[in-house]
Amino acid sequence: VNIKAADNFVKYISSLSKKRRNTNNYQNIGGFGSITNIPKKLKNPKLVASTDGVGTKIEIANELKKFNTIGIDLVAMCVNDLIVQGAKPAFFLDYIAINKLKINKVKKILDGIVKGCKIANCSLVGGEMAEMPGTYAKNKFDLAGFAVGFVERENLLVKDKVKSGDILLAVPSSGLHSNGYSLVRKIFKNKKIPPLIKKELIKPTKIYVKEINKINRNNLINGCANITGGG
């Protein structure tokens, strides 16, 4: 374990986190937990939390040596689970576990996380990086994300609101997102992947926060679901 490299990485994280913090969050870099305020404009606020990863899409990123978008996937997989319940993402935390800390590689991953938070309009308030050479094989890593959002109680999207006669709308995906990659890797095992296919495979998961929240603000949604991983 390279302590000096880890310390340098923490400084890099701190600089990025400060850029993505808003006035609702206390400046608590170096603390044991992140602190935030509940929006005062909400009369009966409910907190919605979600955690997720990006599955074996990580192996595609490793194979293509492209790490600057996998962080966007991580944010997307978490915040997209918040918005289908009517919540507006407020803050995000990440967990990176890796065989050996390679600063440039992990910086690119984190840059993607920061970009994802910017798209989702939420704050990156903390995280954890674990270097575990005895657990992960050479060059291997894994990611986990944690997102929290707020919603007014009456605006929660619950299945009880869905009724017969409702109009069903399907929103297209931007690609494979972050599901089904075990099958994809099986199909392309021991085969040369064409450049165009490579580009599609690593395309980041679309973050639907702006679109869904805008519609929900006008009370136009009774129910919402992510049709990924079985729906």
Regions found by a protein language model. Name each.
Residues 1-231:
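Helix-biased detector of long, well-ordered alpha-helical tracts
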